[in-house]
């Protein structure tokens, strides 16, 4: 991703984090993971603990650290609605503590995993979301991520830290069997011979991006020393109905769909402008069908043909 560096990856044992850590190791960086659980490879140094604990955070950010990639967060909209206080503790308080440790230890770069949910209600059905779209989050998740972005911006402005707020769209890919977002729900439904619930009539537009494209985007932001928000998505919006149809094609399962009312915090549409990331060299490589085909083997019954 850049010259050999000492990198702290918070949330590095998670779905996105594991891919990020592997890429960093391949490029020869010295990596430390801070997470609630150990990294699957025991050779990777892991600090197991809760970053909401000041002692854990202090031990995580060692003198000599060059870069922090902060992926640890409450990432579920539903979980944030159910427990907004816990969401604030991790997404805001822990982020603020890491930024202060970044300042104290003279860490030069801080890459924050954010989300396009920070714009929330600012996205009308015909509006293309850019880095300049007004922040109008609809949920505690979006609000806490917006707060994290503002904290990062203030530290970049006051203390000279290079800080990028990477606004991921809906990330999918191999290794998400424990996730409860829509694509793994489709995969489980195909495996178990069940159906899925589709909120609304299924015509809402969504941008879904493959995890390997996200890793590429993180690298582009780091190499380019990007400051401020940066949208990382596929740049190709699809309807929820198209996602269901593609899952049927990839899995060979019927996956019946039941339409249910739209829930709290649903953005009316997600149509992203990724030109700023492209200017840094970002080139998303996966279309929806190709990407889903990389997810299905993790869920497929033994002997099934992906």
Region annotations inferred by a language model:
Residues 190-306:
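C-terminal substrate-binding subdomain of Rossmann-fold SDR/epimerase-dehydratase oxidoreductases
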Residues 97-140:
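Conserved Rossmann-fold NAD(P)-dependent oxidoreductase catalytic core, especially the SDR/UDP-sugar
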Residues 45-67:
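Conserved Rossmann-fold cofactor-binding substructure of NAD(P)-dependent oxidoreductases
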Residues 7-27:
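N-terminal Rossmann NAD(P)H-binding glycine-rich loop of SDR-like oxidoreductase domains
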Residues 115, 149-174:
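Conserved beta-loop-beta element that borders a ligand/cofactor-binding pocket
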Residues 119-120, 139-140, 164-181:
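Flexible, glycine-rich beta-alpha linker
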Residues 144-147:
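Active-site helix of classical SDR
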Residues 63, 82-110:
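NAD(P)-cofactor binding segment of oxidoreductase domains
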């Amino acid at each position: 991703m850049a010259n050999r560096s000492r990198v702290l990856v918070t949330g590095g044992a998670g779905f996105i984090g594991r891919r990020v850590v592997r890429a960093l190791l391949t490029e020869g960086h010295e990596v430390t993971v801070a997470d609630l659980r150990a990294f699957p490879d025991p050779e990777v140094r892991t600090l197991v603990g809760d970053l909401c604990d000041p002692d854990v955070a202090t031990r995580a950010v060692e003198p000599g650290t060059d870069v922090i990639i902060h992926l640890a967060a409450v990432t579920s909209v539903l979980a944030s609605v159910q427990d907004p206080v816990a969401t604030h503790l991790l997404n805001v308080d822990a982020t603020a503590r890491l930024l202060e440790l970044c300042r104290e230890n003279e860490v030069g770069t801080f890459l924050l995993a954010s989300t396009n949910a920070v714009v929330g209600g600012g996205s009308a059905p015909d509006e293309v979301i850019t880095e300049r779209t007004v922040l109008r989050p609809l949920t505690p998740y979006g609000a806490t991520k917006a707060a994290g972005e503002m904290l990062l911006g203030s530290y970049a402005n006051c203390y000279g830290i290079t800080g990028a707020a990477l606004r991921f769209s809906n990330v999918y890919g191999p290794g998400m069997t424990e996730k409860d977002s829509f694509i793994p729900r489709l995969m489980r439904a195909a495996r178990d011979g069940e159906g899925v619930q589709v909120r609304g009539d299924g015509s809402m537009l969504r941008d879904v991006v493959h995890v390997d494209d996200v890793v590429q985007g993180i690298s582009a932001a780091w190499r380019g020393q990007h400051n401020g928000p940066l949208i990382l998505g596929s740049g190709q919006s699809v309807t929820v109905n198209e996602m269901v149809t593609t899952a049927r094609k990839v899995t060979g399962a019927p996956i019946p769909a039941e339409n249910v009312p739209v829930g709290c915090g649903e953005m009316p549409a997600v149509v992203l402008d990724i030109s700023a990331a492209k200017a840094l060299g970002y080139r998303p490589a996966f279309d929806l069908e190709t990407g889903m085909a990389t997810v299905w083997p993790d869920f497929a019954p033994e002997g099934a043909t992906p």
